[in-house]
Regions:
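Short catalytic micro-motifs in class I SAM-dependent methyltransferases
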Residues: 105-109
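A conserved beta-strand element that flanks and buttresses the S-adenosyl-L-methionine
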Residues: 102
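Class I (Rossmann-like) S-adenosyl-L-methionine-dependent methyltransferase catalytic domain
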Residues: 1-96, 110-193
């Protein structure tokens, strides 16, 4: 719904350069053939940077076809190099696993124990190597785009993903929205065990 009526500079999660995500991905020293999925990508710029860096096996998932259409239009012919999936993450059942599962700002929209359980099950089944989760920290907002969210600290993140994953590192940082407000995020990376 949001992507039908708003441009990137009108939504709080817009991030021109997804630096924390790129830093985590670079730290894994991945081959360019690594299978990377961006969960709840919306119209963010991560796929642009991954393509520019030569990654060849990228999947972009979002519940909004409008958001994905905006990204496809922005990428032009490069969009043909990406696997596009329109799905709610709690209904997503891929055919194979991913070397990297990246999620910036989707996990915190899952507020019921059932939604969270399904998400954790999907991650457990379909992540072969690395997991990156960026979500609102305990200092983050109470709502986002009018929707309720769930906030996390490092211990809660580690516990949430403790079944099958070992935490590599976590960072907290302020994301500056297009309207110059600050939102505090926690990013954690995990390795499959």
């Amino acid at each position: 719904m949001v992507y039908k009526t708003k441009n990137p500079d009108q939504v709080s999660w817009t991030q021109k350069i997804p630096q924390p995500s790129l830093d985590f991905i670079h730290s894994f020293n991945l081959p360019k053939t690594a299978k990377i999925i961006d969960i709840g990508s919306g119209d963010n710029m991560l796929v642009d940077y991954l393509l520019e860096e030569g990654f060849e096996n990228i999947t972009v998932l979002d519940i909004s076809i409008k958001a994905l259409d905006k990204v496809k239009k922005r990428l032009g012919e490069k969009a043909q190099k990406v696997n596009w999936v329109v799905s709610d993450i709690t209904e997503f059942q891929p055919d194979s696993t991913f070397d990297v599962w990246h999620d910036r700002a989707t996990f915190h929209f899952l507020v019921t124990s059932e939604q969270i359980s399904v998400y954790l099950d999907r991650a457990s089944k379909y992540v072969s190597d690395y997991l990156i989760i960026g979500t609102f920290s305990e200092k983050g907002p109470e709502r986002c785009s009018g929707l309720p969210i769930r906030k996390y600290d490092e211990d809660q993140m580690s516990l949430s993903f403790s079944d099958g994953f070992k935490k590599i590192s976590c960072i907290t940082l302020d994301h500056e929205t297009p309207f110059k407000t600050k939102q505090n995020f926690i990013y954690c990376s995990f390795r499959r065990i």
